[in-house]
């Protein structure tokens, strides 16, 4: 936005009665764009917007002839906004007012460049290729494209022949490279050059304006449909600061913004979108914050729906959050939100997975995740507090977080295919750096928790190193005698897991458990195995006992099942180590 466009916007707002205290001044800066600065100290400064310039669902309802029951009214609002921006040949008239002329100063003042990753060029997007944002781009496009197609194909007012290329792109989206999509759609959106107002590039531009600038209509109208949104000129110039204490409220149909407390001279007056991490800020608003205390990593866990159903029915203490549990508005319908969160949930609510957010500032953020991974690790007779299940859950969660950390690679090699915007590089670097820091901190906390649990419960844990130290007969005589008929061939033991199985087989056969480890024999005797022989048992028997008859397949299967259900494996240590747990 230029200084002239800002001046014209403020004059336009004043002509409709927008109230801005004289102590506040909007300025254009090269560093931050538009800012609002206090020229003097002012207590509780407020900005008030009259209903005449609120861009709401009333406009598309009247123009398109929609009803209160029309589905996706926000989608129609985005189409309407695209029309007043890009339909240069026809006036858009509502209540005998040329809406395109009425809002021209506002339209002219909107950003000439959008920084949402949804319109980054291929070279820029490569800097996000290994992150949640980069991995979700295709899915987001698919959702926006589908919304557009359902709207334009639902009414005869849209000539689909004129947007046939966009329709074809929608149907072939899975087959297109990102480079092709950028050339066909995104470049047109980014440069704001759609030639047809109901084309997908026009709709995408409007969509990006709304996700970066919209306010909940609930502030003005408590009886509005759920999630209904509005645009509020002038107020949407204020930048975000999570430390800013503000309130939004209606006053005789006007929207009112108020800064709580004193706004100091020469300081910027800011809005507050709520606590948002850099992933949400970059995806929705096109910027990031360094040292953002609300920064988080989203970890999506996809579970079979029958597992979800069982958890919902039998494990009420397990938290399976939906995205709506995290998403809040700075001014939300609390009654509606509470009812929504109390509503009975079903497995189909989690068809896209369960999403957890990890935040360094929240000491308890890993607990729900660890509970879930413990549940997924536990044997049928165990509960969430059993030591073995808990330790195995820690291993599973560590592996998942380490895998996610490993997937976030460094900046790609220099790519000259497209010009790269330095600001977008900055945003990508801050975002990815934050993701890595959070994952590393989470892994450190899990490692510390594991170390504490291993130390406090060492009397209940049996490692192969302890066995070799306290049961020398196993390695010196029993194990060699078991394989004495191998024709001189060297027997290689693959892991401590294999050695534990062999130890249990030998100790049980010879009834030679050392006194201090007799608990293993008792635990083994009490263990009930399943009726069928597993493929793992068959493979193990073939690997070690194919040439001898001393150990039958059923014995091997029993020992394997016992070790699986009574041990955990530290796969995150330098070497995998299987450890038996006393129950």
UniProtKB/Swiss-Prot annotation:
InterPro entries: Efm1/Rkm1, SET_dom, SET_dom_sf, SETD3_SETD6_MTase
Entry-linked SUPFAM superfamilies: SET domain (SSF82199)
Any one Gene Ontology cellular component term annotated for this protein: cytoplasm
Compartment list: Cytoplasm; Nucleus
Superkingdom of origin organism: Eukaryota
Keywords from the named record: Coiled coil, Cytoplasm, Methyltransferase, Nucleus, S-adenosyl-L-methionine, Transferase
A GO BP entry: methylation
Residues that hold S-adenosyl-L-methionine according to the record: 273
E.C. numbers: 2.1.1.-
Entry coiled-coil feature ranges: 378-407, 433-459
Gene Ontology terms, MF aspect: protein-lysine N-methyltransferase activity
Domain SET residue range list: 22-274
Family membership noted in the UniProt record: Belongs to the class V-like SAM-binding methyltransferase superfamily. RKM1 family.
Function: S-adenosyl-L-methionine-dependent protein-lysine N-methyltransferase that monomethylates ribosomal protein S18 (RPS18A and RPS18B) at 'Lys-48' and dimethylates ribosomal protein L23 (RPL23A and RPL23B) at 'Lys-106' and 'Lys-110'.
Additional observations: Present with 4800 molecules/cell in log phase SD medium.
Name of this chain's protein: Ribosomal lysine N-methyltransferase 1
Organism: Saccharomyces cerevisiae (strain ATCC 204508 / S288c) (Baker's yeast)
